[in-house]
Amino acid sequence: MILDAETHEQVAAVHRILRGVEGLALPGRVKTELFASVFETNTFVCATAAEVDAALPALRRAAAEAAAAEGLAIAAAATHPFARPEAQPIVKEERYVTFVGYGGISVRRQGVQGLHVHVGMPSPEDCWRCLDAVAPWLPLVLALSANSPWFGGELTGMASNRAPILAELPRAGTPPPFRSYGEWEAWVERLVRIGVLEDYTRIWWDVRPHPALGTLEVRMPDQPTDVRLSAAFAALVQALCATALDGGARGGSPRPDYVQNRWSAARFGVRAKLIHPDGSSFLPATELAAELLELVAPAAARLGSAKLLARIDPSGCEADMQLEAASPQEAAAGLVARSVA
């Protein structure tokens, strides 16, 4: 998010940020998003989570320096504590203007930011097998990453208010239980053929195949403020996918369990109680987090990312830090202070 350095109000200055980083040798790119007061950072393809850990801070520092040169600041979180997203100008690009025309207020409310992690897949069917295996664990990932308790100047009572706002969109939130990649592909092709979708990128589930990139895209985490946590959650997602591909992360719970867990994780963060991915028990998120970290530990060791996973604290999430603020203005100031290491 792009903020006034003094008031911490959002500022529609994305093109000023883009000009400020133009020509720099960066490990990725800085680009526009729906709102002109927000920018997106994408790393280039990384072979390891350690590469992500180097690339993301470099991208964020470059954007912060470009902002400072304009008398601005940046802040990373899943929502701005007091700005109203409906009041934010839209980037005047055809895809965004069309999107707002299609979705109306449900799109104008999408002043929310998340962390998206792409993991390369061996084949389309492996991608779908991996999706089915990792999906039951994703509400726990939301609980651990929850970072949006404020919205429009109010405490929402949610650890992640981003999650229910995202779910206001069609084809968002919980992924439906297709039986195979081929079944999903046929559904997408039918919706494109009859004019519902332009392509599969108009599907915004918490996890989705991305055939053009050959990846499984996990979109569940709230945007971390601490950039080191971004790399940690990327490492967690990679290790979970690797474990699933090895047959070690089988989740047998039905999709209604996912819906329940998604809401509980959004509401309570790490203090949620969640249905176990195998459907056998109802337990604190902290206990389930310990089980998940143990489950993915062999894959993380093999991938060289064990130290990154150690950054994840199963007993707390960044929403807790925001809740220590006495006002939304104080919360915004804290985000600015913590966003650039």
Descriptions of predicted regions:
Residues M1-E70, P85, F99, N161, ...:
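C-terminal accessory/tail domains of diverse enzymes
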Residues A77, P81, E94-L115, V119-P122, ...:
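Metal-dependent DNA replication initiation modules
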